[in-house]
Regions:
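N-terminal pre-catalytic "stem/leader" segment of glycosyltransferase-like enzymes
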Residues: 1-103, 371
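Active-site proximal beta-strand in glycosyltransferases
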Residues: 90-96, 108-131
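Membrane-proximal helix-turn-helix segments that form the acceptor-binding/catalytic region
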Residues: 135-156
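Donor nucleotide-sugar binding/catalytic pocket of nucleotide-sugar-dependent glycosyltransferases
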Residues: 151-205
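Conserved donor-binding/catalytic core segment of Leloir-type glycosyltransferases
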Residues: 198-227, 233-237
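Aromatic "clamp/platform" in nucleotide-sugar-dependent glycosyltransferases that forms part
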Residues: 271-272
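Short hydrophobic beta-strand element within catalytic cores of glycosyltransferases
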Residues: 289-292, 299
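A charged, aromatic-enriched C-terminal amphipathic alpha-helix characteristic of glycosyltransferases
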Residues: 313-371
Length: 371
């Protein structure tokens, strides 16, 4: 029997990574059962405990993540030494930006063990607004590392077409045209557009649906330059009659955060970096109106009524030019919240079916192990 090994991303309690650690193994295992027959066993390769304090403004701890990944590599190496990795096994990296995939490929190739590997891409230096993109940019060592990791994966999973196109344009070269990266490799199954495995969100958010709403507008993002918190702070000054809260600054627990989503009328984004966006989906599940720019992944994910023109918040200067329009947009959504409830339901359906369901991910893995 084949085995599926989840090489996970370290869990931070306030991030979705802790939820994936709890839910993904069970969700994946349920899809690998046919009647009473187990098609494959799911095992996790965890790197142990990790610092809960992320590097300021970042998604994870830049030091701790390397300790975590090194521990994972040690376990993988020991598995090969003990003969525990077999033909037909599948390794799923829940964060594709993990250099240990190169050593995994090295061991499998040299030992003649026929495995397949999938990686879920979130961000990298190819995104100029991401932490790596801002601090490292197009440094040769980083771009070549990303190309190498991409090559190691048999399936590269992306949650949005926007992400695929950005990846291909940045990592394509003069001799490897962009259309090859995006179209040819997509047709061959090397690139797979699929929703993230977050079916649990709807159940998880149910207790917070139906809460009494108040005139609360949330900034649910990391406080980082690519999320443009200064625009949100200025909006708060323009609309003093409403309550504006930057969630990360409150030190919320996950439950506190979900309660805030349940009570809020609006979730606001002026992001210049987003390859999926989870918080606005969580908000929509509890009838909180998303206000998002018509750019990035929002462009393909959002229905028209919840997107505003991208130029309004491309940067702070453009925001100042269009501040009156943004202020009126926020005021309308707060004052007429109930009018938008049917549209919120429509938005939830789009997001749930196409972007926050792991069905295509599971289907791909199932096919790779022969079912």
């Amino acid at each position: 029997m084949s085995r599926v090994f989840i090489v996970d991303l370290e869990a931070v309690e306030t991030r979705y990574t802790s939820e994936w650690k709890e839910h993904l193994p069970n969700q994946l295992q349920q899809t690998l059962v046919s009647d009473t027959l187990i098609l494959a066993e799911v095992d996790e390769i965890s790197g142990g405990d990790t610092p809960q304090a992320t590097t300021p403004g970042a998604f994870l701890n830049f030091g701790g993540t390397n300790v975590y990944k090194s521990n994972q590599l040690m376990q993988i190496g020991e598995m090969f030494c003990k003969g525990e990795v077999q033909d037909g096994d599948y390794f799923l990296y829940t964060d594709a930006w993990n250099p240990t995939v190169i050593q995994l490929k090295y061991m499998a190739e040299l030992l003649g063990i026929k495995i397949q590997i999938g990686g879920m891409w979130h961000a990298g230096s190819y995104d100029p607004a991401d932490f790596l993109g801002r601090l490292i940019g197009d440094a040769d060592w980083c771009r070549h590392a990303e190309r190498s990791m991409f090559a190691c994966y048999d399936q590269n999973f992306f949650a949005s077409n926007f992400h695929i196109e950005m990846f291909g344009k940045a990592l394509g070269t003069a001799d490897v045209a962009t259309d090859y990266w995006i179209n040819t490799l997509k047709n061959r199954g090397k690139i797979v557009r699929c929703g993230w495995p977050m079916e649990y969100e709807e159940i998880q958010m149910t207790p917070y649906k139906g809460m009494d709403k108040r005139n609360l507008i949330l900034f649910p993002h990391r406080v980082a330059p690519e999320k443009q918190p200064d625009i949100f702070r200025d909006l708060a000054e323009q609309l003093p009659e409403y309550e504006f809260v930057m969630c990360q600054e409150q030190g919320y627990s996950k439950n506190d955060y979900h309660n805030a989503l349940g009570e809020a009328k609006v979730v606001f984004s002026a992001n210049t970096q987003e390859t999926l966006g989870i918080s606005w989906y969580e908000g929509a599940l509890v009838d909180t109106i998303p206000i998002v720019p018509d750019r990035l992944s929002y462009k393909e994910m959002g229905i028209e009524e919840f997107k505003y023109p991208s130029e309004w918040t491309v940067d702070f200067d453009k925001y100042m030019e269009h501040r009156d329009e943004v202020v009126e947009l926020v005021r309308d959504r707060v004052e007429n919240h109930t009018k938008y409830l049917p549209l919120i339901n429509k938005q939830v359906t789009v997001l749930k079916d196409d972007f926050f369901s792991g069905k295509e991910l599971y289907k791909t893995i199932k096919h790779c192990i022969g079912y």
